[in-house]
Curated annotation (Swiss-Prot):
UniProt-listed GO biological process terms: phospholipid translocation
This protein's record includes keyword Oxidoreductase: no
Name of the protein this chain belongs to: Cell cycle control protein 50A
Keywords: Cell membrane, Cell projection, Cytoplasmic vesicle, Disulfide bond, Glycoprotein, Golgi apparatus, Lipid transport, Membrane, Transmembrane, Transmembrane helix, Transport
GO cellular component: apical plasma membrane; endoplasmic reticulum; Golgi apparatus; phospholipid-translocating ATPase complex; photoreceptor inner segment; photoreceptor outer segment; plasma membrane; transport vesicle membrane
Protein purpose: Accessory component of a P4-ATPase flippase complex which catalyzes the hydrolysis of ATP coupled to the transport of aminophospholipids from the outer to the inner leaflet of various membranes and ensures the maintenance of asymmetric distribution of phospholipids. Phospholipid translocation also seems to be implicated in vesicle formation and in uptake of lipid signaling molecules. The beta subunit may assist in binding of the phospholipid substrate. Required for the proper folding, assembly and ER to Golgi exit of the ATP8A2:TMEM30A flippase complex.
Membrane topology: Multi-pass membrane protein
Length: 372
């Protein structure tokens, strides 16, 4: 129903007078001021308004239309999600039978590093490009103090922030009277396990090529993260700084390739994008399909070699490796499809119930008989 309010020609609400001999005056002739709002449609709350009237003729079709739209969309998303290949290995080593159990109690400074190997079998081939992720559980990257513990100016290559990091980085701002680069708790806790994948055929191990470039967002790689400005090599540019406390080597030694070293190292950039939930995964490597005639990872036996550097047992965390393909909607996530199907089904069911009620009671006389 449309309800229109039109401003009528009315008095402005101010006291009459102001001319000679008319109206109240104060102190010799000024008009008495008033706090009453002006007589306008806006200030007097007379703007046009529209209010829908909910009838069976409008509500029932809306329920059925929503149901008929949401259910097919949900089925399509759910089927697409189920077609994504995914394989997950938990290599925390909590179980005594796990090959990585010997590495469970490693610390940040454990030398030599602990290594373990987990053999597994892929029942189905992975046809398209494969994405390798590492996953952590019970790790709260969304903690307020943790999220703030970084210096974006330093990470963007500002030379003054390099030698004088933000106080938000405390207690990982300086070490031994030298500024830490990169500073903060996020950088200090960077994931540093090394994962290697091998295909086993006829007792022969063949290394799977893992691509380490292209795993970070373009805007992060080219805009948010920059190395310090200067013409020298990274060792000279980072002179006067020290590495994070838990790192085994400084930031300018993260990679041998200049375009993937320092603050623009893609493993580092991926880690610095904090997760919203305590159980998360981050992209580690890419496995590209080399031939349209051969699957990227064919069904068969594989082994995962792990250099176990990252301690999680102290906070009851878990670590895992995930191999996954993707689709137009991203990675495997059945929740979205289930949500669409559920909402569509509820709307369709309510439409049927309300249609029955309307058919049974809609034509009854609603006027009340008042006895004499």
């Amino acid at each position: 129903m449309a309800v229109n309010y039109s401003a009528k020609e009315e008095a402005d609400g101010h006291p009459a007078g102001g001319g000679p001999g008319g109206g109240a005056t104060a102190g010799g002739g000024g008009a008495v001021k008033t706090r009453k709002p002006d007589n306008t449609a806006f200030k007097q709350q007379r703007l046009p308004a529209w209010q829908p009237i909910l009838t069976a003729g409008t509500v029932l079709p809306a329920f059925f239309i929503i149901g008929l739209i949401f259910i097919p969309i949900g089925i399509g998303i759910f089927v697409t999600s189920n077609n994504i290949r995914e394989y997950e290995i938990d290599y925390t080593g909590v179980e005594p039978s796990s090959p990585c159990n010997k590495c469970l109690n490693v610390s940040w400074d454990s030398t030599p590093p602990c290594t373990c190997t987990i053999n597994f079998t892929l029942e189905h081939s992975f046809e398209s490009n494969v994405f390798m992720y590492y996953g952590l559980s019970n790790f709260y990257q969304n903690h307020r103090r943790y999220v703030k513990s970084r210096d974006d100016s330093q990470l963007n290559g500002d030379n003054s922030s390099l030698l004088n990091p933000s106080k938000e980085c405390e207690p990982y701002r300086t070490n031994e009277d030298k500024p830490i680069a990169p500073c903060g708790a996020i950088a200090n806790s960077m994931f540093n396990d090394t994962l290697e994948l091998y295909h086993i055929e006829n007792d022969t191990r063949t290394a799977i090529t893992l691509i380490k470039k292209g795993i970070a967002w373009w805007t992060d790689k080219n805009v948010k993260f920059r190395n310090p400005k200067g013409d020298g090599n990274l060792t000279a540019l980072f002179q006067g700084t020290t590495k994070p406390v838990n790192w085994p080597k400084p930031v300018y030694m993260l990679d041998s390739e200049p375009d993937n070293n320092g603050f623009i190292n893609e493993d580092f950039i991926v880690w610095m994008r904090t997760a919203a939930l305590p159980t998360f995964r981050k992209l580690y490597r890419l496995i590209e399909r080399k031939s349209n005639l051969q699957p990227t990872l064919q069904a068969g036996k594989y082994s995962l070699n792990i250099t176990y550097n990252y301690p999680v047992h102290s906070f009851d965390g878990r670590k895992r490796m995930i191999l996954s393909t993707i689709s137009w909607m991203g990675g495997k996530n059945p929740f979205l499809g289930i949500a669409y199907i559920t909402v569509g089904s509820i709307c369709f069911f309510l439409g049927v119930v309300l249609l029955i009620i309307h058919h049974k009671y809609g034509n009854r006389n609603t006027s009340a008989d008042i006895p004499n």
